[in-house]
Amino acid sequence: MTTFDAFTQLARGRRTSLVMEPDRAVDHDIIDQLCELASWAPSHKRTWPWRFASFTGDGRSRLGTTMATDMADADFGDDAKRTKTQGKYLRAPAVVVVGCEPHPNEMLHLENRDAVAAAIQNLLLGATALGLASFWSTPALTRPPKVLDLCSFSPDDRIVGVVYLGWPG
């Protein structure tokens, strides 16, 4: 099998799935490896705009509560939507929030966001190669101040995706 054939098989085999073993943890070393792999995505002008924050265990609940608080502060969604948000990050054993450093130049900002999307694809392909299930979602708010702080992101950063990771169920 050629490298191209192996890559084609990997890319075609990647699926979006939240069917995961809820109690089987994803090791922090694996999450770190996936984030490092993600950082090999191309970025024009070497801006390296991606930001990663991972949540496991009780951290997922903190993420949900913090996002729901930001939603309430922004008067976004009703109580039912905020309540749903509080628990949604418990759907997978690991959650990676992926942020993007903005750029004042609109064209460079768009290029940065594209680079972060490419980084997420690298992360998803790496997860598939390791046998993990994955799901890329977009949060209700892309600039939630308390979530950005929880993630140790800059207040100006934007969230491009939330990636759920777990072992297939």
Task: Give, region by region, the residue ranges found by the protein language model.
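Small-aliphatic-rich amphipathic alpha-helix that forms the alpha element of a beta-alpha
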Residues: 38, 102-150
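Short, histidine-centered active-site or binding-site loop motifs used for metal coordination
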Residues: 15, 100-102
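Short coil/turn connectors at secondary-structure junctions
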Residues: 91-94, 132, 155-159
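Short, charged/polar surface micro-motifs in flexible loops or helix N-caps
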Residues: 57-62, 68-69, 102-104, 145, ...
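Active-site-flanking beta-strand signature of metal-NTP-handling nucleotidyl enzymes
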Residues: 95-99
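N-terminal amphipathic, basic helical "cap/leader" segment at the start of enzyme domains
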Residues: 1-91
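A glycine-rich helix N-cap at a beta->alpha junction
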Residues: 75, 151-169
